[in-house]
């Protein structure tokens, strides 16, 4: 009984900061976009609008729950829960510091890839169960987009695995103590980041929820409390993807110079280093949203299959070839 309570406490210790970071990610996005568009942004609720996400959450919770009469009600309610659960499960293998991971098992990378692939089911259920043309078309777009860019995403991760020789996320971080992988793998980092934008349905790849075409895409018929689940899942995926990018290419919780990290320090500076890197990647997500226009859907698919995929395959062949040629393979 004590072990179960201890495990639940561990999960809460990880889950609460994640949900808070998701809440404040919305404030960061609105303030940054406001600055880029020469306007103030939210500035009423709390100091520097820090209480704005809680006001938005309260507004959504007290709204009326409207259910379409022709909807498949079981899947209609299940879809946002599935999407949020798979978004949060990805944090189970993320090391937030040395020894600070819920589960540090040897196949953590494969676990993360599997969850990112399964997460599309919630979106597909949402579009189909709502019995709406807008929602259904949005879910089909999302499914096709995520399956397509999953290939690029997986190829980029596989290149990192070939370089470090392990599937364990902690070992990948520890292998970057001297050199972060963004330096030797810069083209692969660019491919990974572009595919991460597509995986999270962010601009310029936000076709599944294009407001001017599909109202709100697969979320069109969802409102009130169940819409909050989709909202949390979307921004939770952005925070997770930013942290994962920092781990794979920016050294995770490693940071130079090492003298900053005294072993007897009261403050866990290494976790702060990971958080700073993740926030910088999140800023990049917001910057791209405020800068780039939405792509046409046929251009998006052509860009993936005829542009990015051949480059990803070529780089995936080049990385092990160079490792073998210079006799620096980790295997």
Swiss-Prot record:
Main subcellular localisation: mitochondrion
Compartment list: Mitochondrion inner membrane
Listed GO CC annotations: mitochondrial inner membrane; respiratory chain complex I
Any one Pfam family match given in the protein's UniProt record, by short name: NADHdh
Catalytic activity, as annotated: a ubiquinone + NADH + 5 H(+)(in) = a ubiquinol + NAD(+) + 4 H(+)(out)
Enzyme Commission designation: 7.1.1.2
Membrane topology, record value: Multi-pass membrane protein
Family assignment from sequence similarity: Belongs to the complex I subunit 1 family.
Purpose: Core subunit of the mitochondrial membrane respiratory chain NADH dehydrogenase (Complex I) that is believed to belong to the minimal assembly required for catalysis. Complex I functions in the transfer of electrons from NADH to the respiratory chain. The immediate electron acceptor for the enzyme is believed to be ubiquinone.
Listed name of the protein: NADH-ubiquinone oxidoreductase chain 1
Organism: Mycosarcoma maydis (Corn smut fungus)
Name of the coding gene: ND1
